[in-house]
Amino acid sequence: MKRLLFTLATCCVMCACEQKTEMNPFFTEFQTEYGAPDFTKIRLEHYEPAFLKGIEEQNAEIKAIVDNPEEPTFENTIVALDKSGGILARVSGVFFALTEADTNDSLTALNEKMAPVLSEHSDNIYLNQDLYKRVADVHQQEKEGKITLTTEQHRLLDKYYKAFVRSGAGLDAGKQSRLREINKELSTLGIAFDNHILNENNAYQLVIENEADLAGLPEWVKAGAAEEAKAAGKEGKWLQSLAFFAIC
């Protein structure tokens, strides 16, 4: 009897874990027209697990590229690198679009939390010496005429090679360590700066008491300013913020 109960409990836990995985919409391709995000299924609690799983997935994909015993080629190095990070790309595309256009306190807090984590992940890729050597090898192959690439393939190779060089892949270990510290600090300060600007923009109010000062403005702009003033408890006046009016 005890064995049966243990088995049932184990099955329940496994099913719950599987259900939890299936419930996160970022873990699989969006099953929508054109692959657009299905915002009816996306919730705040989905983002952080998706970021972490995306990092884990891409780390494994990068390791597979580096551990490949075959000589570096465009397909097994550049294409493989370009295709890595599917989950991370999906969650990043949605998350950062929202933090730029429709953020809130919860998204802002998560953005601050994930910034140094994502910065470290990026450095782990572009400062990975074994991966850089493979990319540089393919770049050298094309430079010496050993391989012929299409215009699109050349562009992709050039993009990644320059990304590694410009990210510090050629620096010595000491300078790379310092670069990691700088990148981590910049990721945090950059978000703090953006938040300060957003807060100042949201707080700004220009209250207009004399309608003559609105001369020349379209009626729909005046109406919008009057509505904003009313909502702010300043009925009978006009309020101009830094938000955009919807054009009807």
Model region roles, listed by residue range:
Residues 17-248:
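Zn2+-dependent metallopeptidase catalytic domains
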Residues 1-22:
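Bacterial Sec-dependent N-terminal signal peptides
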